[in-house]
């Protein structure tokens, strides 16, 4: 079974990219959907690729989806690496695009992408050896790692109306995905993504995009994330509804999320020693937090990979 890996990547420090962003959506604010942390690049991809070389060398090809950019350190002559520009897979009316949620709806358009593939953000890392069986079951269907934390309607209503804690943009677009699948299949999946390296069948993404073409069409002109977007968890929910995937709930020993502005979580990381971990930037992180995160990654993955010049 050939298994590829797809990353989304942006260098938010690039003046040319910044000018394009500012002309389209204005300068970044501290609002979550358009904050500096959303586009910050501190070299995380380099360390993620080092973790791939260390723990998942069996991956066939690595596609890096970008907006007319590529990391200066990237060895593009490596036969495993292919840089894909947004305009190769997205419609003209979506460009330029600063909305990762929308970009993720076009992964099946990547030329040469295998049927079985993994998707990762550049802040995801592997911490232990993994095999294809970590991501795909013996029947070839993806293992869908989700968070058991309550995401059902009552829990969301209670949060909104009793606790007075409105849903974040991220949770809103996941809820949109769950409610859309419920509308068509009659089942509401009360689980949500958990910052994993996720597995997919390309055919399921194509099937879902065709099935929900009308519902997805309002997203097309959304250059930045919007509250009525539909998160890519919709592909996992459809896979479950169509019996094209296997649901597994995660624990901190499987996947651990480090908020780089919370240094106490580094101690928790050592306690759990997870298979996967995420170094999550945010609107609350500062340059000192990002330096500490890179120092941590350098200690975990000090060896230069074949993907670097």
Question: PLM features: residue spans?
Answer:
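GT-A fold catalytic core of metal-dependent nucleotide-sugar glycosyltransferases
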Residues: 70, 107-147
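N-terminal anchoring/stem segment of glycosyltransferases
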Residues: 1-88, 243-244, 269-309
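Residue-level detector of short, conserved catalytic/binding motifs and their immediate flanks
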Residues: 3, 60, 115-117, 122, ...
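Long, charge-rich alpha-helical interaction segments
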Residues: 142-221, 226
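Short, flexible helix-coil linker/hinge segments at the edges of structured domains or between repeats
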Residues: 78-92, 130-151
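Hydrophobic/aromatic-lined pockets within catalytic cores
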Residues: 57-60, 108, 112, 125, ...
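C-terminal catalytic/acceptor-binding lobe
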Residues: 211-309
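A conserved donor-nucleotide-binding helix/loop in the catalytic core
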Residues: 39-56, 89-120
């Amino acid at each position: 079974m050939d298994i590829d890996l797809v990353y989304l990547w942006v260098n938010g420090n690039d003046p040319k990219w910044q000018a394009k962003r500012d002309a389209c959506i204005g300068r970044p604010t501290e609002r979550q959907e358009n904050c500096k942390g959303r586009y910050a690049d501190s070299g995380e991809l380099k360390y993620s690729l080092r973790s791939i070389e260390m723990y998942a060398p069996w991956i066939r090809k690595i596609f890096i989806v970008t907006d007319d950019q590529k990391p200066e350190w990237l060895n593009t002559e490596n036969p495993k690496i292919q840089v894909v520009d947004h305009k190769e897979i997205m419609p003209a009316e979506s460009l330029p695009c600063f909305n990762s949620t929308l970009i993720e709806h076009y992964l099946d358009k990547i030329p040469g992408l295998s049927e079985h593939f993994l998707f990762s953000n550049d802040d995801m890392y592997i911490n232990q050896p993994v095999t294809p069986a970590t991501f795909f079951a013996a029947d070839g269907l993806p293992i869908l790692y989700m968070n058991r934390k309550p995401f059902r309607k009552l829990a969301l209503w209670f949060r909104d109306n009793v606790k007075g804690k409105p849903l974040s943009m991220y949770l809103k677009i996941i809820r949109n995905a769950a409610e859309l699948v419920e509308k068509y299949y009659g089942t509401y999946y009360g689980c949500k993504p958990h910052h994993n390296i996720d597995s997919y069948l390309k055919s399921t993404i194509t099937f879902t995009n065709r099935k929900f073409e009308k519902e997805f069409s309002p997203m097309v002109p959304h250059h930045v994330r919007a509250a009525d977007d539909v998160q890519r968890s919709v592909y996992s929910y459809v896979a479950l509804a169509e019996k094209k995937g296997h649901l597994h709930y995660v624990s901190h020993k499987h996947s651990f999320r480090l908020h780089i502005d919370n240094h106490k979580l580094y101690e928790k990381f050592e306690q759990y020693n997870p298979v996967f971990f995420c170094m999550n930037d945010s609107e609350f992180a500062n340059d000192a937090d990002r330096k500490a995160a890179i120092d941590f990654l350098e200690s975990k993955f000090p060896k230069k990979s074949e993907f670097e010049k």
